[in-house]
Amino acid sequence: MLNAGRGNPNWTAATPRRAFFTLGQFAVDETQRVWCDGDLAGMPFKKGIYDRFKEYCKNNKDAGGIDLLEEVIEYGIREHGFEPDDWVFELVDAIIGDNYPVPDRMLVHIEKIVREYLIKEMGGDPKTDTHDIFAVEGGTAAMCY
């Protein structure tokens, strides 16, 4: 979602960028739900996170990009059969960004979506098993330029 908001030298795509920041707000709320001591917070908790996300969306209908963010979550569940808690947790844990240098390659769910997108854009059949996507830091920037 972050790169979807990347424009060129003189523009940005506002809705994906807002969705990215709204996901970040939800993620920080999740860390503080687990443990909060002043400016310190805990780590997101997976069990029930999808339901908490849906509740967050219901209570924050005016948050920037919330409709897109909800659709991204539902797309993964609907089109890829992702288990809802696993999918939302992966995104939340990723945006918190405290697992460096893990993972050593793309996140499990994200890799499936990126793979499908790249194969489709290159004119292939995303349903084939002939492609292995191994993107690392800087890989998306290389694709942009």
Regions found by a protein language model. Name each.
Residues 1-71:
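Conserved N-terminal helix/loop that builds the PLP phosphate-binding region
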